[in-house]
From Swiss-Prot:
It comes from Vibrio atlanticus (strain LGP32) (Vibrio splendidus (strain Mel32)). Residues 38-41, 162-166, 243-248, 276-283 are annotated as: Interaction with substrate tRNA. This is tRNA dimethylallyltransferase. Belongs to the IPP transferase family. The record marks T104, R126 as: Interaction with substrate tRNA. The lineage of its organism: Bacteria, Pseudomonadati, Pseudomonadota, Gammaproteobacteria, Vibrionales.
């Protein structure tokens, strides 16, 4: 008889949809342990602008995979998959259920489907590409990518240096294009996954929550948090940490490119766009149960039933 795979729960959703509150309430009721699935919460010293759970919330419900990196460091979907599976196995060994909570859809996809066998980052080649970008401009590098990998060039915008650099780096390391390599899937996830997504039914309610959240961030000292990061000589706006929504716009403000009101406006707009992308991902997601942000009791009951019926 085949041994039953361990249960894991995914709680996905757009930014500001109430995922964290729901996860904390579920943990108070059931033996679940929370793993964060968020490419911004991984960074230390980035608490306010990421809406990281506060000390009180973390005391009630510790989150794994937050505050694990300095903002100067990069973290890939492959890094996340390795770390998340390690934490999931530890949680199961403790006799508990992994509850993965967040909105970084690429991380969930990597976890479920595995990853293509892409080469590890090569700092020397990255520096070489960065030097070329300064000398020739990103458009010239995009033209280069179009010649070797037109499919990736169609997908990657010339103003997206992070992805453009990675596509060129992969080719220079391996001699194969990103398109070739991503057609090969990795290992699937050795868990039985029940997947849920939470969001308000009305888009205007999500927009209201996003605006309110940004206002609260400013009141809580987001500008001072940003100034501390801006003062560091090892940080710059091309880093994944500073490219996070909100941080990118506040960096522009500190650079003198706009005033604070404009930075807040841009930050809210960028957050709305992020939420729209997250919802687009989720609408095409298979085997997903939707929960209503405005009916937390019902959402909690649905999650409770999923655990109790297993």
């Amino acid at each position: 008889m085949t041994e039953k795979l361990p249960l894991a729960l995914f709680l996905m959703g757009p930014t500001a949809s109430g995922k964290t509150d729901l996860a904390i309430r579920l943990r108070q009721k059931y033996p679940v342990e929370i793993i964060s699935v968020d490419s911004a919460l991984i960074y230390k010293d980035m608490d306010i602008g990421t809406a990281k759970p506060d000390a009180g919330e973390l005391a009630l419900a510790p989150h794994r995979l937050i505050d694990i990196l300095d903002p100067s460091e990069a973290y890939s979907a492959a890094d996340f998959r390795r770390d998340a599976i390690s934490e999931m196995n530890k949680i199961v060994a403790e006799g508990k259920i992994p509850l993965l909570v967040g909105g970084t859809m690429l991380y969930y996809k990597a976890l479920l489907e595995g990853l293509s066998p892409l080469p590890a980052a090569d700092q020397e080649i990255r520096k070489q590409i960065e030097a070329e970008s300064i000398e020739q401009g990103w458009q010239a590098l995009h033209d280069q990518l179009r010649e070797i990998d037109p499919v990736s060039a169609e997908r990657i915008h010339p103003n997206d240096p992070q992805r453009l650099s990675r596509a060129l780096e992969v080719y220079r390391i391996s001699g194969k294009t990103l398109t070739e390599l991503t057609q090969t899937k990795g290992d699937s996830l050795p868990f039985r996954v029940k997947q849920f997504a939470i969001a308000p039914k009305e888009r205007k309610e999500l927009h209201r929550r996003i605006e309110l959240r940004f206002e609260k961030m400013i009141e809580a000292g987001f500008e001072d948090e940003m100034k501390a990061l801006y003062a560091r000589e090892d940080l710059h706006p091309e880093l994944p940490s500073i490219r996070c929504v909100g941080y990118r716009q506040m960096w522009d403000y500190l650079d003198g490119n706009c005033d604070l009101d404009e930075a807040v406006f841009r930050g809210v707009c960028a957050t709305r766009q992020l939420a729209k992308r997250q919802i687009t991902w989720l609408r095409s997601w298979d085997d997903l149960t939707w929960l209503d942000s405005e009916n937390i009791e019902q959402a909690l009951e649905t999650l409770s039933d999923a655990i109790a019926s297993d």
